[in-house]
Swiss-Prot record:
InterPro entries: Dihydropteroate_synth-like_sf, IspG_bac, IspG_bac-typ, NO2/SO3_Rdtase_4Fe4S_sf
GO biological process: isopentenyl diphosphate biosynthetic process, methylerythritol 4-phosphate pathway; terpenoid biosynthetic process
Record's protein name: 4-hydroxy-3-methylbut-2-en-1-yl diphosphate synthase (ferredoxin)
Highest taxon above the source species: Bacteria
Length: 406
């Protein structure tokens, strides 16, 4: 394969506000397509034991209904693998088809082969797929030993690859920084290089079997490691002429505000660089709470628009009304108008200029009076008490209002 040319940074590229995504192939996962010609896809994972058919179906449906486009389930045993057939059938019968990914770990060759019959994508971890017996007194691997284990991996992986290839299904090669195989640790260290080489070993096996429905992930719990691993993976794939999509995530990000910030620091940084085709925010919370974070990251970067974009200034001494309270009222009245940009600005000093890209603006004019804008044009001045109502009337007059869902 020929190397993929990466654009050289120039002055023009430094001031370019468009995110140029790394060119990747289209990989279908059920009825969803992942790749650079498609929107960045949002994923999550249910907490339920997949032996609980009803509970798993309900959990998958809950996630899908709030925007999770691909749902992953854990498959630790053959019994769990077989239950996926019932879960898929029950979803189709009572709801609709949802793309399902099976997560296979720990010497899971037979499990992966069984579950491949029932799901749309199988995720394997190169560090755990073939068990390597750790040796306490080992100090390294010879080339022959390294190659011998590589051949064992090929023998074990080939039936799964052939099954997925022949069914037109997908595989995620999901490397985790915390579970690199022993020989990778001895050879490359606990490094992004070791993560990349671990993925490349599996990719090459798949390519040799003419299987290319691959998605790659390089997850770590520390953001700097995760960033380095994905950047290096993208660089190496480009050099090798590989165009496989990347699944982004910071594993074990934690919960609350910091978990969200940590995930955004990793995922958002790479997306801004054009790296990444599907994302999962991993929080130690209910899976449903991951989905809004994903869509907020994508909206903030302009990669997907699934909600109203609110522009609002911080409060300062010039603010002519209670900005926080008014923003809350405006948001409450308009947050269903997906696709609009609405600005709420406290005064006319910076307001009109900083909200110029918004569709509509609500700007403090004088004490007790606000101005309503359509784009850069001031439409009317109204008493503050009528501001939100008149903003709605303006949107209605322009034919851009829809009633909120009941």
């Amino acid at each position: 394969m020929q190397a993929v040319e990466r654009p050289v940074q120039t002055t023009d590229s430094l001031v370019d506000t468009t995110i140029h995504r790394r060119k990747t192939r289209a990989v279908k996962v059920g009825n969803v397509t992942i790749g650079s010609d498609y929107p960045v896809v949002v994923q999550s994972m249910i907490n339920e034991d997949t032996l609980d058919i009803e509970g798993s179906v309900a959990a998958i449906r809950r996630l899908h209904e709030i925007g999770c486009e691909i749902v992953r389930v854990t498959v630790p045993s053959m019994a769990h693998a077989r239950s996926l057939a019932q879960i898929k059938a029950k979803l189709a019968e009572t709801y609709q088809a949802v793309p399902i990914v099976a997560d296979v770990h720990h010497n899971g060759m037979k499990i992966a082969l069984e579950v491949a019959k029932h799901v749309d994508k199988v995720r394997i971890n190169p560090g755990l797929y073939v068990f390597e017996q750790a040796s306490g007194d080992r100090t390294g691997y010879t080339e022959a030993e390294f190659a011998a284990i590589g051949e064992k991996i090929r023998e074990t992986l080939e039936p799964l690859v052939v099954s997925l290839r022949d069914q037109g299904k997908a595989m995620r090669i999901g490397v985790n920084h915390g579970s690199l195989a022993e020989r990778m640790l001895f050879t490359y260290g606990d490094t992004p290089e070791g993560m990349v080489e671990s993925a490349l070993e599996f990719i090459r096996i798949c390519q040799s079997l003419d299987f290319h429905n691959l998605i790659i992930s390089m997850k770590a719990s520390r953001v700097p490691v995760m960033l380095a691993a994905y950047r290096l993976m993208a660089k190496r794939m480009d050099e090798l002429g590989m165009d496989y999509p990347l699944h982004l995530g910071v594993t074990e990000a934690g919960d609350g505000e910091y978990g969200r910030i940590k995930s955004t620091a990793g995922i958002g940084t790479l997306l801004a660089e054009g790296i990444g085709d599907t994302i999962r925010v991993s929080l130690t919370e209910a899976p449903e709470k991951e989905i809004p974070v994903c869509y907020s990251i994508l909206q903030a970067l302009g990669l997907r628009k699934t909600m109203v974009e609110y522009v609002a200034c911080p409060s300062c001494g010039r603010t002519l009304f209670n900005l926080e309270e008014v923003l809350h009222k405006v948001r409450e009245a308009t947050n269903h108008l997906t696709g609009l940009d609405i600005a709420v600005m406290g005064c006319i000093v910076n307001g009109p200029g900083e909200m110029a890209d918004a569709d509509y603006g609500y700007v403090g004019k004088t004490p007790g009076v606000i101005s309503l804008y359509r784009g850069r044009e001031e439409i009317r001045k109204v008493p503050e008490a009528q501001g939100v109502e008149e903003l709605i009337n303006l949107i209605k007059a322009d034919g851009r209002w829809v009633d909120p869902p009941q």
